[in-house]
């Protein structure tokens, strides 16, 4: 049974409150009393009363204290408040607190103070939270609710800003969209080929690429009217990257095609669908460039080691870059092969050697006997790269490039027996090279920030000048005299 506290610390959005507890001989009795008084504010006020309250100076101070408490640190405002509010002789004083993480910091500030948490303290704080407006009669109730709302918004905003790896959320969504686009493009590409092959079946063999096929279908459309379009040959040449031989084959095959004639309405629908498919393929390429750019900002070392797409899939499967950095190399190795792993454990057969890492070029280069070894080694380097990217203030791709060279040296060792460099020597070289790159990146960021600030100031100045010009009184036009008309 926990000890009965003399005081309980309650952290409100408006400030710190010290609640005085009615004296009880046994914690079991106070627990029964508190449980019985939860629904009745008057009964609860007979057990708990407000001894002291210290409001925060402003919203910034409230947010600062809130962040300190969430990290388990006693803010100077809190220690000053307890120093003033608690009895001078703290040797036999028992203080109840909500969070056990705060105990260590308070014990350093008040060595003689006895701290308790959990059990009856939780119930007292729950009742205090419900009936605080009744207990704090002198405080305006509307200001308490406003303080809670303001602090809630500020704390949430600071947490979102503190998440330095929030860019990985964009990577996760983008790689999921890329995978979905690949499926849709393959499905739509086959559909347009089947549809247009009724009219021009030979084009399927002459243009196997889906993107070029879709563009050719839009350009040619009705093969019987190709002679009417004088610029058609140039369009086909452009689509086929100036391959004149292939262009001549397509034009010749269109003249002697065995396809059936299709109405203009059907051809119009084929044209619209083919244009949509080709635009989807163009957007897919743009999305790939976007993922590459995001990965260079979010995880440059991981991207340099195994490529943008495989790295993005690892982050997506782990849930975030932070989660991936926390995984051991053995988990990274089989990430994406969970079904095969559990099936192997259930049937007591061999566990999988790799998951998403199979799509890396290193696994394809390795021999059959060495695929498992290379997979283990690559997973180890991926784990290191993820941790470097996650916990570096200025992530750069230097470490990933050196780690990639290590994997290539290991492949060379398996094939020719050439002994690679020691890991400690490679990491020293990487550290020296990374320092120079980081300095350049920081300089670029500072220049970009200065430029953005200057542009913002110019924009504000221009807006202010425009408003002044609008507010300035316009000169009145003189009325023409009617004397001349008379």
Swiss-Prot record:
Domain Nop residues, every copy: 298-416
UniProt entry tagged with the keyword Nucleus: yes
Pfam family, one: Nop
MF GO annotations: snoRNA binding
Annotated transmembrane regions: none
Keyword Ligase on entry: no
InterPro entries according to UniProt: Nop56/Nop58, NOP58/56_N, Nop_C, Nop_dom, Nop_dom_sf, NOSIC
Compartment(s) of residence: Nucleus, Nucleolus
Region of interest (Disordered), residue spans: 450-486
Keyword tags: Nucleus, Ribosome biogenesis
Basic residues composition-biased segments: 475-486
Biological function: Required for 60S ribosomal subunit synthesis.
Protein name: Nucleolar protein 56
Taxonomy of the source species: Eukaryota, Metazoa, Ecdysozoa, Nematoda, Chromadorea
């Amino acid at each position: 049974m926990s000890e009965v506290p003399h005081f309980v610390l309650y952290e409100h959005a408006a400030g710190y409150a010290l609640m005085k507890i009615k004296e009880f001989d046994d914690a079991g009795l106070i627990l029964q009393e508190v449980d019985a008084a939860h629904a009745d504010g008057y009964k609860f006020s007979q057990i708990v009363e407000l001894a002291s309250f210290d409001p925060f100076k402003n919203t910034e101070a409230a947010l600062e204290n809130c962040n300190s408490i969430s990290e388990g640190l006693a803010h100077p405002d809190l220690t000053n408040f307890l120093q003033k509010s608690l009895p001078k002789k703290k040797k036999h004083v028992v203080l109840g607190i909500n969070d056990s993480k705060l105990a260590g910091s308070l014990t350093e500030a008040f060595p003689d103070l006895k701290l308790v948490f959990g059990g009856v303290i939780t119930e007292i704080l729950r009742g205090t939270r419900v009936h605080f407006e009744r207990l704090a009669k002198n405080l305006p109730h509307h200001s308490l609710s406003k303080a809670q709302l303001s602090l809630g918004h500020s704390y949430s905003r600071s947490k979102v800003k503190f998440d330095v790896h929030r860019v990985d959320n964009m990577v996760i969504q983008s790689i999921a969209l890329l995978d979905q686009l690949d499926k849709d493009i393959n499905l739509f590409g086959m559909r347009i080929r089947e549809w247009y092959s009724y009219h021009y079946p030979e084009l399927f063999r002459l243009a196997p690429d889906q993107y070029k096929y879709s563009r050719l279908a839009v350009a040619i459309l009705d093969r019987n009217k190709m002679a009417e379009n004088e610029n058609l040959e140039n369009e086909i040449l452009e689509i086929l990257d100036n391959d004149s031989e292939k262009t001549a084959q397509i034009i010749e095959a269109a003249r002697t095609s065995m396809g059936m004639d299709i109405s203009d309405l059907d051809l119009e629908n084929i044209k619209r669908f083919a244009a949509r498919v080709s635009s989807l393929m163009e957007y897919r390429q743009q999305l790939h460039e976007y993922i590459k750019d995001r990965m260079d900002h979010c995880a440059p070392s991981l991207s340099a080691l195994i490529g943008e797409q495989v790295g993005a899939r690892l982050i997506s499967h782990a849930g975030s870059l932070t989660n991936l950095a926390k995984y051991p190399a053995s988990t990274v190795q089989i990430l994406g092969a969970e079904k095969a792993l559990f099936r192997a454990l259930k049937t007591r057969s061999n566990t999988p050697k790799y998951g998403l890492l199979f799509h890396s070029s290193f696994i394809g280069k390795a021999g059959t006997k060495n695929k498992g070894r290379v997979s283990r080694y690559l997973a180890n380097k991926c784990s290191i790269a993820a941790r470097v990217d996650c916990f570096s203030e200025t992530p750069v791709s230097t470490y990933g490039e050196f780690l990639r060279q290590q994997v290539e040296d290991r492949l060379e060792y398996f094939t020719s027996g050439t002994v690679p460099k020691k890991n400690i020597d490679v990491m020293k070289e990487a550290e020296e090279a990374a320092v120079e790159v980081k300095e350049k990146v920081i300089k670029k960021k500072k220049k970009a920030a200065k430029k953005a600030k200057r542009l913002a100031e110019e924009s504000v100045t221009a807006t202010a000048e425009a408003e002044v010009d609008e507010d300035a009184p316009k000169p009145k036009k003189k009325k023409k005299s009617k004397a001349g008309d008379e």
